[in-house]
Amino acid sequence: MEDIVKEYIDTKCSIQFLAKKYKKDAMAISRAIKKAGYEVVNRQNLIKINEHIFDTIDTEEKAYWLGFLFADGNVSKRDNCFEMSLAEKDKEHLEKFNNFINHSRNIKLKKVKLNNKVFNAYRCSFNSKHFCDTLKQYGCVPQKSNILKFPDENIFSNKNLIKDFLRGYFDGDGCITHCNKEHTIIAIKICGTVEFLNKYQNYLPLNNHKITITRSVPELTFIGGSGFTICNFLYQNSTIYLERKYELYKQYCRSYKKLYELLESKIGEGCDANTEQTIDISQGSIAA
């Protein structure tokens, strides 16, 4: 019961919500809270969000966040609870989402245990039947990891918004990395179910890529020029993105520009394969 009391104090959840979540008697939780020296208040109507924000997908921001939720959002199976937790390094991105839905509460710090180590993360959570039902209708369902399907393209008021959905999903379940020791060749990976990824790549400028299975996880991989093409497609002229991945994209843009300028300067000069001039795009380890 001590953990439930702590969650009541830390998250501002209602007693009714905690009773459903932990299958405990609401009165017993109330008594435990009072015994711990805290006041019991009616929180049922204190937490507010714009629960109709996804009723129509008609802006870049809505399409992007829907894609991100398909990757990292969590809709509960029974109690109409939504939760999204991100690593501490992405705290600002979660705050953007919190502002996007006009959440009346701030995001909360939580401790996550992984491989016997404890890490800081931040969580946005609330109860809203309409919000959760809308996500489920689009395909963002509970326990979606192994059953996720791509949404019907007709939910987007403009087909151009599908690209923003793709970017949102990539920011959540994709990565930008390298595939050689010198960190000079870009590689991007996108994880998901086979069914979802097959539909996802249909909207990319390069498709028909083979989906590989790595540690039981299906993924699409694009290397070198194809990886750069996909990044360009996803991020160019966009206004909302995960900042750290966008910075990696810009870093590769600068490096590829230098490479192209070098190659152009060598045209007609009898390019020396052993030239001492190199292009360094590592600037440390590139991974996201």
Language model feature labels by segment:
Residues 1-288:
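Internal intein/HINT superfamily modules and their associated LAGLIDADG
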